[in-house]
Amino acid sequence: MFTTIKKTVIGLFTIVRSMWMVNSHALRPRDTILYPEVPVPVPPRFRGRIILSRDPDGDERCVACNLCAVACPVGCISLQKAEREDGRWYPEFFRINFSRCIFCGLCEEACPTTAIQMTPDFEMGEYVRQDLVYEKEHLLISGPGKYPDYNYYRVTGMAVADKPKGAAQNEAAPIDLRSLLP
């Protein structure tokens, strides 16, 4: 009889304790974020969708050097080089297959002109796989992106628009190395 009362008291105590724990957790604020209504905070170095940026002058930054396609471990980037009348290279077509992309950022690191940049945009869900193949028109933005003052042709010292080195806008004259000798 005593053991039956003891088991009943212990059973009631465990039920009351369980109800107390459930009710205390039910009144706490939720840890779950309701995704579409509440935007997800992304870390500062998050690597999302790839874009192609422009120079401060408004030209495409991409010079079709093909380094991004070589650096890509899954081979989702393809492009074809063409040349303008002034001698500047540009991609005739630039294609990224985001269904194969692993968003590693190696293409951004390999790009010498900072044309390829990663954005914090990650909402790229599609029902048709072909819709995840982005062409140059979809990737090209109107601004310079993360690096607003960088102009590849100004930094490399290449002649622009049939002007000799040092004659372009905001460009210093070439340095004669022999004049620096003692």
From Swiss-Prot:
It is found in: Cell inner membrane. Its EC number is 7.1.1.-. One of its GO terms (cellular component) is plasma membrane. Residues 50-82, 92-121 form the 4Fe-4S ferredoxin-type domain. InterPro entries: 4Fe4S_Fe-S-bd, 4Fe4S_Fe_S_CS, NADH_quinone_OxRdtase_chainI. It catalyses: a quinone + NADH + 5 H(+)(in) = a quinol + NAD(+) + 4 H(+)(out). Pfam families: Fer4_7. It comes from the Bacteria. [4Fe-4S] cluster 1 binds at residues 62, 65, 68, 111. Keywords: 4Fe-4S, Cell inner membrane, Cell membrane, Iron, Iron-sulfur, Membrane, Metal-binding, NAD, Quinone, Repeat, Translocase, Ubiquinone. Belongs to the complex I 23 kDa subunit family. NDH-1 is composed of 14 different subunits. Subunits NuoA, H, J, K, L, M, N constitute the membrane sector of the complex. This is NADH-quinone oxidoreductase subunit I. It comes from Psychrobacter cryohalolentis (strain ATCC BAA-1226 / DSM 17306 / VKM B-2378 / K5). The lineage of its organism: Bacteria, Pseudomonadati, Pseudomonadota, Gammaproteobacteria, Moraxellales.
